[in-house]
Amino acid sequence: MRILVNISYDGLFFIGSQKQPEGRTIQGEFEKILSNLFKEDIKVIICSRLDSKVSAKNFVFVFDTENKSNISLEKIRRFLQDSFNTEVLIKTVIEVPPSFHPRHDVKYKIYSYKIQNTAFFDPLISSHLLVVFQPLNLKKIKQGIKLFEGLHDFSLFSSDSQEKNTKLIINKTWVKKTKDFISFYIIISICFKFLDYMARIWHRSFFLFYIRSLYVYK
């Protein structure tokens, strides 16, 4: 049987989502926990490869098991949740068709970045976002982020010089302001992928260019 698990996790506690020879990863941790539960070698297929320190709100993965002990889905969920502290939330555990694939069958992915735009910073959340003290010009930021929509060559936004296909499509971008926070959102279709470190370099470059060079302040 193939089982899908939907989680949210705090990226500060992991060096990434994909399994690495050393260090704590989402894929590596769940493979160890599930192998211990089912008493068989469990391999996890993750929906996306996220960088170190990147958090996820709806991150899914699947695994296959013979489940000879006939363990219920709710027991699996509780066992997984009890294996973590507060860095991971197990949202749902469901059975899916054997053909379901968490990367190939998803329609799109949404990437988000948040700025705390106030005269002070909150030390309880500042490690999870960018803090900008000067008032930002939201109108100019909205105009700037729209430049990334459509088909473009993003080779300068990748750390992999060997990547052959660097022309990608960003379907939609938008900016949302709520009180002291400004959030940026990027939507890409599953038929396209982000290059290595593209999302991280993309948003860093955007802020360096628009905040430092164009002075997008009020």
How should these model regions be labeled?
Residues M1-K218:
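Structured-RNA-binding interfaces characteristic of tRNA pseudouridine synthases
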